[in-house]
Amino acid sequence: MLQNPGADGMRTLEYGKEHEKTLLFLPCTAEPEWAFADSVGLLSQDYHVMQIVYDGHGETGEDFISVETTVDEVTDWLQAHGITRLNAAYGCSLGGACLTRFLALGKIPVERAVIDAGITPYRMPLILRRLACLRDDLGFRLIAKSRKVLETVYPPERWTMPGRDPVKEYDALAAYLKTYSKRTVRNIFWSANNYTLPTKPAERGCQITYWYGEEEKQARHSNVSFVKQ
C-alpha cells in the first residue's frame, strides 16, 4: 500500500499499483479506512485501486469542507499523477455523492461506475433541508458520544464480518468517530444533501449502476430516479 497526501489533508491509499486498469474508490463517511480492507484487497487483485480518505476523517488536522471541494481535490490528484481516464469508479453514500458530481463534471472519463446508496441533492424547501441537516448532525453526535447508542443503531452481530472480534472493532470505531470535528460533521451532512451539479451533465458514455440494500428500496427510490435523469 502506498499513501499519498493531498494538498489539503486528503489522502489517497494506493493498492495494486502494478496493474494497468484503474479504479477510484470513494468510501462512505463514519467508517475508518480499515473497514474497507477486504473489499479493496479483492479489487486490487485486478485493479490499481485508489482509495480516498477525506479531509476531516481521522486525525488529519483538517476539516471536511464539501463534496465540491473533495471532487476538485480528487480530480487534481488524479491529473497530477498522470491519470486521464478511469476504468472503474465506486462511491458509497457520501462517496456516491462525490462520484455523482465527479461523473457529472466529466473532467476525467470513467468507463464503469457503481454508485452504492449514493446521496443525491435534496429537492425540497431550504427550511426543510436545514432541519434535515440538524437532525442528521445531532444523530451523528449522539452515536459518536454513546457506545450504547452506537450498538443499538448498528448492532455488532449484524455489522461485524465473520471471524472478526466485535468488541475490538467497535472499540476502534467508537474511538474513530470521536475524531470528527463539529465543523466536519455539519459540513458532511449539509454538503452531501445539497451539493451542486452542472446544469447539463457531461456526456462521456459511462455505464452507471446504482446499488441499494434490500431494506433501502423505498428510501432510495428518489436517488435512483435522480441518477436516471
Model regions and ranges:
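N-terminal cap/lid segment of alpha/beta-hydrolase-fold proteins
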Residues: 1-10
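Conserved serine/cysteine hydrolase catalytic core
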Residues: 183-226
